[in-house]
Curated annotation (Swiss-Prot):
Cofactor: [4Fe-4S] cluster
GO biological process, one term: terpenoid biosynthetic process
Annotated source species: Pseudothermotoga lettingae (strain ATCC BAA-301 / DSM 14385 / NBRC 107922 / TMO)
Key word Nuclease present: no
Cofactor note: Binds 1 [4Fe-4S] cluster.
Catalytic activity entry: (2E)-4-hydroxy-3-methylbut-2-enyl diphosphate + oxidized [flavodoxin] + H2O + 2 H(+) = 2-C-methyl-D-erythritol 2,4-cyclic diphosphate + reduced [flavodoxin]
Protein name: 4-hydroxy-3-methylbut-2-en-1-yl diphosphate synthase (flavodoxin)
Taxonomic classification: Bacteria, Thermotogati, Thermotogota, Thermotogae, Thermotogales
Gene name linked to the record: ispG
Family indicated by similarity: Belongs to the IspG family.
Amino acid sequence: MSKTLKIANIFLGGNNPVVIQSMTNTKTQEVEKTIRQINDLMSAGCEMVRVSVPDLESAQSIKLIKQKVRIPIIADIHFDHKLAIEAIKSGADKIRINPGNIGPEWKIRELAKVAKDYGVAIRVGSNSGSLRKDYEQKHDRATALAESALKEVSILEKEGFYNIVISAKSSDVIETIKANEYISQKVDYPIHLGVTEAGTHITSTVKSSIAIGYLLLKGIGDTIRVSISGDPVEEVIIARKILMSLHLRKEGQVIACPTCSRCEINVEQIAKTIEALVEKNNLTVAVMGCVVNGIGEGGHADIGVAGTKNGAVLFMKGKIVKTIPKEKIVEVLTELIVNRTDKLG
């Protein structure tokens, strides 16, 4: 089991729930835009958010951002440890450094002293896109990713700094898995999971679900980020669904059949219409295209419909309640979901 750290108001590691992260894609110095995006991410279920800090203005903007948001802010630092120090002084709750480009040992030691004084955690995050050549020459890429991060961790420890999170991300699923398995055998710091440069929506969803899901099932990982080339809110939604699928989160879900020639209703349209409402109400709702297997397959759902020639059969926990016309399916389901009651009206 990993150690437990406290990042602002979030407990990370140990027996605590897996924490969902994302990263803004706004210019951090554009404070109002960044605040809006962070609040959108928080509304979607994000619990910690990372912001890029490429310059002094971005580092100093963290102070203003912190005044308007209610989740921990992580400052993403490359190359310049002085920006990390400035971000800490501006109120960052956690720092991410890249061992591939942060520089010589004295810089890490200097950063560790300031982070220790301010009680701020550091994530050492290695990345396949910025591995040092000497590590690549000594090891296979997965081991190089892991050893690169572990070396930086050892420098922090020498400075008496143990408020550490560690990560190793590749754009390759297998490399990501192997690197994190390696790390989990060496240290007990909380591990942040993700696949870097995972791509656009579909590709990222597949890669992230496999790598993150596999590692979490093995008991590896304390916080996750799904990386998507696009709207970061989608990252949070997918992360939630990964955790829900692994029974690490409990929230509502729509189960729906893949449809075939027996389908009598527009399964996809109905499912999409009610999905957001279902998730908020912590129910399982089944939308099945026909009655052949629909009631049996959706029998464990709190509420469900199965299409018929003239409409749909409404069932609850596998028991048929009544039939409803096609044009009333969404209306009836919505009423039941909102009321969370067996009253049919």
